Each structure stands twice: as C-alpha cells, then as structure tokens.
C-alpha cells in the first residue's frame, strides 16, 4: 500500500510556503467535513506532487499548490491527468468550489460547478 499517513485525510503538498494564497480551497474542504493534512516542500512539479499526495492519502485524494496554481489529483487517475487545475487569479468562489469538489470526491457525491 502506498499510503503512509494513518489518519484519513486529503494530503495537501504546499510548495514554497503558499498555503495562505489558497485559503478558500481549504475552507471548501472544511465545509464538506473532510480533514486535510498539509505537508510543506521547498520545490517540485505540481502535477506529480499532487499525484504523490493522492498516493499517500488514505482517502486517495491529493492536492498540490504553488504560488501560481493548484492541482487536485486522484490516486486511480494517470499521474499526468489531474482531476482539477486551478489558477491563482481565479475568483474566491472557484477556489472554494474546488475545495468542496476535492472533498466531494472523497464522499462520492456530485461535484459543484466551479463557477456557480
């Protein structure tokens, strides 16, 4: 088993200490009642980091973010094919809905429209 975290949580890899830029995404995950675990890395490819986070998450969902973009990945997808990619300039509602959708993937319920 690839998972190395015992508590069920979405694993979020934060590259270059940028978690505060993506606060709305974290709030979206919290709104859905799913825990998350932040792990900090000084550098890395965002898509690969998200896939590695998904592989290490007991919930099979991983996120990686840097100062420019955020990627949501699922362990059962190909490494090069993330589920969602969000750019930092997108509005706070799109960020919140992306967090909701990452959590909804765990729950197995329909996604929200990113721009609704």
UniProtKB/Swiss-Prot annotation:
Reactions the enzyme catalyzes: ATP + H2O = ADP + phosphate + H(+)
Molecular function (Gene Ontology), one example: metal ion binding
UniProt KW keywords: Bacterial microcompartment, Chaperone, Hydrolase, Magnesium, Metal-binding
Stimuli inducing this protein: BMC production is induced by growth on 1,2-PD vitamin B12 medium.
Top-rank taxon: Bacteria
GO biological process, one term: propanediol catabolic process
Disulfide bonds: none
InterPro entries linked: B12-dep_deHydtase_bsu (IPR010254), Dehydtase/Dehydtase_re (IPR003208), Diol/glycerol_deHydtase_re_ssu (IPR009192)
Cellular compartments per GO CC: propanediol degradation polyhedral organelle
Subcellular locations according to the entry: Bacterial microcompartment
Pathway of action: Polyol metabolism; 1,2-propanediol degradation
Entry keyword annotation includes Ion transport: no
SUPFAM superfamilies in the cross-refs: B12-dependent dehydatase associated subunit
Miscellaneous notes: Bacterial microcompartments (BMC) 100-200 nm in cross section are formed during aerobic growth on minimal 1,2-PD-B12 or anaerobic growth on 1,2-PD-tetrathionate medium, but not during aerobic growth on glucose, anerobic growth on glucose or pyruvate-tetrathionate. BMCs can constitute up to 10% of total cell protein.
Function of the molecule: Small subunit of the propanediol dehydratase-reactivating factor (DDR), which reactivates suicidally inhibited adenosylcobalamin-dependent propanediol dehydratase (diol dehydratase, DDH) found in the bacterial microcompartment (BMC) dedicated to 1,2-propanediol (1,2-PD) degradation. Reactivates inactivated DDH in the presence of ATP, Mg(2+) and free adenosylcobalamin (AdoCbl), by mediating the exchange of the tightly bound damaged cofactor AdoCbl for a free intact one.
Assembly and interaction partners: Forms a heterotetramer PduG(2)/PduH(2).
Protein name according to UniProt: Propanediol dehydratase-reactivating factor small subunit
